[in-house]
Amino acid sequence: MKKIFLSVGEISGDNYASELAKHLKEYQITGITGPKMRAIGVKPVANLEDISVVGLTEALSKYKKIKEVFKQSVQALKSGVDLLIVVDFPGFNIKLLKEAKKLGIKTVYFISPQVWAWGSGRVKEIVENTDLLISILPFEEEIYKPYVSDKFKFAYVGHPLLDIIKIYENEDSFKQKLNIPKNKRIIGLLAGSRESEVNVILPILIEAARLLTKTFDDLHFVIPATVNMVDRVLEKVNFSLPITVITSNLSDKNLPKFENPSYEVMKNAVFSIITSGTATLEAAIIGNPFIIVYKVSPITYFIGKKLVKINYLGLPNIIAGNEIVPELLQDRCNPLDIANKTLEFLTDKNLYKTQKRNLEIVRKSLGKKGAIERASNLIRTLLEKGQA
């Protein structure tokens, strides 16, 4: 049985990689895993929770652990692996690709890093150390196509979220499971899946919720907490407010549980406040209006502003080419501004409807369903025939 090492460093990567692993069951798969990968039987060499970071300051605090996980991963590659698949997370994964290349192991980059945001500096490194790059965003083709050769192949497969997003509740059943009165409107508060995001952004969102309750008496706030962040979320929530925390079926906490809690919130909330990341594209696909918030340490923001080559942070805005979803970043990521922007959407029907129309355009631009199946077929061909 051929062996695959699968490396992810973020919860969103775990989401994609677990679906990919389901389509490659004929192979033995190990790697750096998240909760969904572990739940379907991918054997962990290490856990993504140990290496998932945002920004320079958090990376420094976890440097020793990241170095240890990298060493463990290289040892696993040396023990006999036929294929390395890495998912986004370039700071770690590009180095791992280089080690695999030295060992003569075939390599796949599934979901390119955001080279279009950070400039082309990493493109050459990726091309030199990747046999097959599988892209999920349509505009990446023009970046990589000039580099295609016998040694580097590129394929655009469409976006996996079109297959992954499944919603099981309607508004009535969702409210019933959460004991929310029918006459209440749900507002989603999505603070991210990383410790630094929950620590910094969640308290801001909760204070924004408190401000909104002064204007509206019919709002109920729902926070979907990832398995790895449930305890941290519960520590920060002010339960004197109309707030409910929900989590995943994978959690052992005594909370309302759903297969994909974030999706249920995005679908059944009239409006959501969402931390920048993959969740913003998930929300765009689901189609209910939202705003994007983000805040990092001043030094991380300063460095990012110098390096980033794009005008927007949120993926829906990058794809659309303009700010169809308001972005409240850094100093604007504060309770008053967030509450005021939310109030605008709750009181202006035209604003609300316009964003819904724009989100539908973004969704249609992401291609057709079947991305994971197309990706797994490409990987299977590379493994069995030695070429993509």
UniProtKB/Swiss-Prot annotation:
Q: Which GO terms describe its molecular function?
A: lipid-A-disaccharide synthase activity; phospholipid binding
Which Enzyme Commission numbers does its entry carry?
2.4.1.182
Please tell me one Gene Ontology term that the record gives under cellular component.
Answer: membrane
* GO-annotated biological processes: lipid A biosynthetic process
InterPro entries attached to this UniProt entry = Glyco_trans_19
Pathway the protein acts in: Bacterial outer membrane biogenesis; LPS lipid A biosynthesis
Keyword annotations for this protein, in alphabetical order, are:
Glycosyltransferase, Lipid A biosynthesis, Lipid biosynthesis, Lipid metabolism, Transferase
| Catalytic activity field | a lipid X + a UDP-2-N,3-O-bis[(3R)-3-hydroxyacyl]-alpha-D-glucosamine = a lipid A disaccharide + UDP + H(+)
Q: Which domain of life is it from?
A: Bacteria
Any idea what job this protein has?
A: Condensation of UDP-2,3-diacylglucosamine and 2,3-diacylglucosamine-1-phosphate to form lipid A disaccharide, a precursor of lipid A, a phosphorylated glycolipid that anchors the lipopolysaccharide to the outer membrane of the cell.
Under the heading HAMAP family, the entry gives:
LpxB (MF_00392)
Which family does the similarity line name?
Belongs to the LpxB family.
Record-given protein name:
Lipid-A-disaccharide synthase
> Taxonomic lineage per UniProt?
Bacteria, Pseudomonadati, Aquificota, Aquificia, Aquificales
